[in-house]
Amino acid sequence: MRIVTAAVMASTLAVSSLSHAAEVGSGDNWHPGEELTQRSTQSHMFDGISLTEHQRQQMRDLMQQARHEQPPVNVSELETMHRLVTAENFDENAVRAQAEKMANEQIARQVEMAKVRNQMYRLLTPEQQAVLNEKHQQRMEQLRDVTQWQKSSSLKLLSSSNSRSQ
């Protein structure tokens, strides 16, 4: 259930980000989501990697192809979920079915993007791949630190709440 909820929230966040980006964006050649997709993939995955101009062009081509092949976010599914959430009578089974449907669509998009990232990774030299893998390990360590901090903060909060109530 947590996975379904997370996927639904991610989809909702993506759509709201895209709608905001569409309002802010200008220019005839701007495609909603293009900047967001490019920034999220390149700023995280390829930070600290020096790419040749040829590699950059190949990656741009892969991203452009992926954008055109990827199905858009299904706005009607989000509208359906909104109607279920705001309904007079809450129907858990209907919400669960809708959430699973939306989660499956999100999974399909993530798999497609993983394929593109794999193709981009294979464009790198062995040295660039080593740098990328090192950067990844550093990010994972940072995430572990944050997770550990969150756990310890939650435990402190719980223990201080228990001592006050006694």
From Swiss-Prot:
It is found in: Periplasm. Induction: Induced by envelope stress such as overexpression of misfolded periplasmic proteins. Induced by alkaine pH (tested up to pH 8.4). Induction is decreased in a degP deletion. Transcription is stimulated by the Cpx two-component signal transduction pathway; sigma factor E (rpoE) is not involved. Transcription induced by spheroplasting, which removes the periplasm and thus this protein; if the protein is anchored to the outer surface of the inner membrane induction does not occur. Induced in persister cells. Its main location: periplasm. Changing residue 107 to G/N: Decreased protein stability, wild-type degradation of PapE. Disruption phenotype: Hypersensitive to alkaline pH (greater than pH 8.8). Increased accumulation and toxicity of overexpressed, misfolded periplasmic proteins. Degraded by DegP; some CpxP mutant proteins are more susceptible to the protease than others. Degradation probably occurs when CpxP is associated with some misfolded proteins; overexpression of PapE leads to DegP-mediated degradation of CpxP and PapE, which requires the N-terminus of PapE. Overexpression of NlpE does not induce this degradation however. Changing residue 55 to P: No longer inhibits Cpx pathway, protein more susceptible to DegP. One of its GO terms (biological process) is response to stress. Residues 151-166 are annotated as: Not required for activation of CpxA or to induce degradation of misfolded P pili subunits. Residues 1-21 form the signal peptide. One of its GO terms (cellular component) is outer membrane-bounded periplasmic space. The keyword Signal applies. It comes from the Bacteria. Changing residue 103 to D/G: Decreased protein stability, significantly reduced degradation of PapE. Keywords: Periplasm, Signal, Stress response. Changing residue 108 to V: Decreased protein stability, significantly reduced degradation of PapE, retains most Cpx inhibition activity. Disulfide bonds: none annotated. One of its GO terms (molecular function) is unfolded protein binding. Residues 55-61 are annotated as: Important for protein stability, probably interacts with CpxA. Acts as an auxiliary protein in the Cpx two-component envelope stress response system, helping modulate the Cpx response systems response to some inducers. Binds the periplasmic domain of sensor histidine kinase CpxA, inhibiting induction of the Cpx envelope stress response in the absence of inducer; overexpression decreases Cpx pathway activity. Some periplasmic stimulii (shown for P pili subunit PapE and probably 0.3 M NaCl) increase CpxP's susceptibility to DegP, leading to CpxP degradation, inducing the Cpx pathway. Aids in combating extracytoplasmic protein-mediated toxicity. Belongs to the CpxP/Spy family. Homodimer; it might alter shape slightly at pH 8.0 when Cpx is induced. Binds the periplasmic sensor domain of CpxA. Interaction with CpxA is not seen in vivo when cells are grown in 0.3 M NaCl, or if the misfolded P pili protein PapE is overexpressed. A region in the N-terminus (residues 55-61) probably interacts with the periplasmic sensor domain of CpxA to inhibit its kinase activity and is also important for CpxP stability. The homodimer has an elongated cradle shape; a hydrophobic cleft on the convex face may interact with periplasmic protein PapE. This is Periplasmic protein CpxP. The gene is cpxP.
